[in-house]
From Swiss-Prot:
It is an enzyme of class 3 (hydrolase). This is Peptidyl-tRNA hydrolase. The lineage of its organism: Bacteria, Pseudomonadati, Pseudomonadota, Alphaproteobacteria, Maricaulales. Its EC number is 3.1.1.29. CDD domains: PTH. It catalyses: an N-acyl-L-alpha-aminoacyl-tRNA + H2O = an N-acyl-L-amino acid + a tRNA + H(+). HAMAP family: Pept_tRNA_hydro_bact. PROSITE patterns: PEPT_TRNA_HYDROL_1 (PS01195). Keywords: Cytoplasm, Hydrolase, RNA-binding, tRNA-binding. The record marks 91 as: Stabilizes the basic form of H active site to accept a proton. The gene is pth.
Length: 200
């Protein structure tokens, strides 16, 4: 089994925030692959899907973004899933909007959700990093990630989430390099995107 966890905040007012793109990815995956119903488990909402012979647990922690490790750690302990078989989908300030990169291990780079998961599992889990770009000033970061995607960003966002869901068989099989390659081929990042509060 692999665990696919998405980072986000569970209250409705956060639904379309940049910080919730991990939840968005899991919702699209669940819909595309006819996953089972979401149920309250592991301090989150969990759903299961089997792709080929590979079973996946989809997990949306309901702990608020910065405490996601409590949920992911509980699921990992219950199913005895190793960190390398856990993939966390999250927003990435250090990638341009629409860029997608897989990463194995490493630091949290200021992401408190990743930091929380690291405190439970150690650093050696996989990250599926969805670029949202940086507002340019670190004092604007909180407002930026907790604001909705701009209308100008919706086209690449939809394309990227669809590409992630459409390539999931490769991730389920553990072919992470091929997964990243297929996603970026199907949904190349836009060259120029307006972003930030003025883009809405």
């Amino acid at each position: 089994m692999k665990i696919l966890a998405g980072l986000g905040n569970y209250e409705p007012k956060y639904l379309r925030n940049r910080h919730n793109v991990g939840f968005m990815a899991l919702d699209i995956i669940a819909q595309a692959w006819n996953a089972g119903p979401w149920r309250k488990r592991f301090q989150g909402l969990a759903s299961e899907v089997t792709i080929g012979s590979n079973k996946l647990l989809l997990l949306k922690p309901q702990t608020f973004y910065n405490n996601a490790g409590n949920s992911v750690g509980a699921a990992a302990a219950f199913y005895r899933v190793k960190p390398e078989d856990i993939i966390v989908f999250h927003d990435e300030l250090d990638l341009a909007p629409g860029k997608f990169r897989m990463k194995m291990g490493g630091g949290a780079a200021g992401n408190n959700g990743i930091k929380s998961i690291t405190s439970q599992l150690g650093p050696d889990f996989r990250r599926a990093r969805i670029g949202i770009g940086h507002p340019g000033d670190r004092n604007r970061v909180t407002g930026y990630v907790l604001s909705d995607f701009a209308k100008a960003e919706e086209a690449w966002l939809i394309d990227l989430l669809d590409a992630i869901a459409g390539s999931l068989d490769l991730l389920a099989a553990g072919d992470y390099d091929a997964f990243q390659t297929k996603v970026t081929h199907k949904a190349p990042a836009p060259e120029v995107v307006k972003r930030g509060p003025d883009a809405d």
